[in-house]
Design a protein with these regions (language model features):
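Conserved short submotifs of the Hanks-type protein kinase catalytic core
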Residues: 190-204, 208
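A short, aromatic-enriched beta-strand patch in the conserved N-lobe beta-sheet
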Residues: 185-186
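Activation segment signature within eukaryotic-like protein kinase domains
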Residues: 223-224
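Regulatory alphaC helix of protein kinase catalytic domains
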Residues: 165-170
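Catalytic-loop of the protein kinase fold
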Residues: 235-251
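Glycine-rich ATP phosphate-binding loop
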Residues: 134-156
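Domain-scale recognition of modular recruitment/scaffold domains used in eukaryotic signaling
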Residues: 1-132
Length: 399
């Protein structure tokens, strides 16, 4: 924790309408009717100080008024009280004028089901790191469920870090599926800011593939099918994942779950900045033309992940090339040869995912159906699916 970090008083934390560092765009979605209100906080990094605001919807839009807070009082305009709760109670008693506008506080907006508090979680053991912070293993206080906690390491001084964290929170709270990592909520009432997720006891698929090069083909097929079910669910929810890879699939009790939604967008088309770092090895060739990512660019990335699931021993895609070379080769039509031991039917699926024409790639739904059928054949012991790919010096077709 940063030295001399100002803490939020317990009586302020306990206010049902105190939403902590909830970002304005999220708060605005909750302030629906005239008179709806909440209290939020933010850190002024250069002063290392907390600021509190009363956010309220008026006829002309949402207003935010700073509440002056110290150890013994809270003040807004000419009104003051011993703390924020008492101040709000006095403001609710009548219509008041603030900065020349009539303000009536009608309905206090309470925290939603995904807005947890620090007292709701316990965590100590660090298990990894993510794009914007450290990941810990912990438990939910209410039911002792094992959780993974992503901690924003910048302690509220980095607005961009908080924005990235909340992008992930916004999309994850929309989804509930066995092959998607479960989202429990976010914590913004005080520092540190946290995301709370299901803990997956099997770790990342990539790590498993590295540790177990002798993993049986039927298990690899099963993992591929389960991942496709997760992608199909996301696409039906109008969401592009944009970061599909073996490292972003986790395993819990043998079930593969798609994870890491930091790049996920709830839209059918999302334009990326081609000047910024990209996951070149998983990127569909057409993205380099206009920067547009779509459902079929996810499918292309899924094809690369299929290759990851079957290469033995595990290695990164195009591991012998630098990113620039990968970009050139893939745009020119090159695709990696299928790994030895990959079932013929899986090779067909792989090539379909890698079709140079994005419109000829299978949808996530069709992909899931094909992989479900293949998985069922393996479960039934169908000998015909055990044959590996035919040897060929040619790359997969781009027809």
């Amino acid at each position: 924790m940063a030295p001399n970090r100002e803490r939020i008083a317990e009586d302020d934390l306990n206010l049902p309408y105190f939403h902590g560092a909830l970002m304005n765009q999220d708060a605005d979605q909750l302030l629906v009717n005239e008179g709806d209100f909440m209290v939020t906080s933010r850190t002024v990094a250069e002063l290392n100080k907390l600021q509190f605001h009363l956010a309220v919807r008026l006829k002309k839009g949402i207003r935010r008024y700073e509440i002056k807070r110290n150890a013994t009082s809270a003040k807004l305009g000419t009104r003051s009280a011993g703390n924020i709760g008492k101040l709000i109670d006095s403001l609710k008693a009548e219509t008041i004028e603030i900065k020349g506008e009539k303000v009536t506080l009608k309905r206090a907006i309470a925290k939603g089901k995904f807005q947890l508090m620090h007292r709701d979680v316990n965590f100590k053991k660090q298990i990894g790191s993510g794009a914007y912070g450290t990941v810990y293993k912990g438990r939910l206080a209410k039911n002792n469920a094992v959780i993974a906690v992503k901690k924003l390491d910048t302690e509220g001084t980095d607005e961009e870090g908080l924005a990235d964290m909340m992008k992930e929170a916004r999309v994850m709270q929309l989804y509930d599926h066995p092959n998607i990592v479960k989202f429990y909520g976010f914590i913004l009432d005080d520092f540190p800011y946290l995301l709370v997720l299901e803990f997956c006891n099997g770790g990342a698929v990539e790590d498993l593939l590295r540790e177990k090069p002798d993993l049986k083909v039927n298990r690899r097929v099963q993992y591929t099918y389960m991942a496709s079910a997760g992608m199909d669910y996301l696409h039906k929810k109008n969401c592009i994942h944009r970061d599909i890879a073996a490292r972003n699939c986790l395993i819990h009790n043998g079930v593969v779950k798609m994870a890491d939604f930091g790049m996920c967008r709830a839209t059918a088309v999302y334009k990326v900045d081609l000047s910024k770092p990209l996951n070149v090895r998983w990127l569909a060739p057409e993205v380099w033309n206009n920067g547009e990512t779509r459902f079929n660019t996810d499918v292309y990335a899924f094809g690369v992940m299929i290759w990851e699931f079957f290469i033995t021993p595990y290695q990164s895609p195009y591991h012998e090339w630098k990113g620039y070379t990968v970009k050139q080769k893939v745009r020119a039509g090159y695709r990696m040869p299928p790994p030895d031991g990959m079932p013929r039917e899986m090779v067909i699926v792989l090539n379909e995912c890698w079709n140079h024409d994005p419109n000829k790639r299978p949808t996530a739904e069709k992909l899931k159906e094909k992989l479900e059928e293949l998985n069922q054949k393996f479960e039934a012991g169908d000998a015909s699916v055990l044959q590996g790919p035919e040897k060929s010096s040619d790359p997969p077709t781009n027809n």
